[in-house]
């Protein structure tokens, strides 16, 4: 018996699209000076869910970026690092790049590797407090 993986792929892509939209909505509404912990947790969970699904299907590029995003969000939500407008900007750009990567896997469209590299560098710099 052969399992048709296409239906599972479609569920992953549909859910990831919803999670990215929710992430964007929450990021745009965040009060940087006093972020709501529940909103930070919801953004973290969205990144975590995308990472898990991407890992299941072997999408290592998405897994790597969401891991960096998730790690930085975790430090912020634990109070180890203050949220800044720069964080929100990078998170929004990362969300857009993740959407582009999803499209690449889903529809075979091209992915701007320079954009991916730039976001990864910015996430790494922010996680090391190097801005």
Predicted segment positions?
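N-terminal assembly/transducer modules of large multi-domain enzymes
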Residues: 1-131
């Amino acid at each position: 018996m052969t399992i048709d993986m296409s239906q599972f792929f479609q569920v992953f892509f549909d859910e990831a699209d919803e999670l990215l939209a929710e992430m964007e909505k929450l990021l745009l509404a965040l009060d940087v000076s006093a972020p709501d912990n529940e909103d930070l947790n919801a953004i973290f969970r969205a990144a975590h869910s995308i990472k898990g699904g991407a890992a299941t299907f072997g999408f290592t590029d998405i897994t790597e970026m969401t891991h960096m995003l998730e790690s930085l969000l975790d430090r912020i939500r634990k109070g180890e690092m203050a949220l800044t407008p720069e964080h929100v900007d990078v998170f929004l750009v990362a969300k857009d790049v993740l959407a582009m990567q999803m499209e690449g896997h889903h529809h075979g469209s091209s992915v701007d590797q320079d954009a991916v590299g730039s976001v990864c560098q910015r996430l790494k710099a922010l996680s090391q407090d190097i801005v």
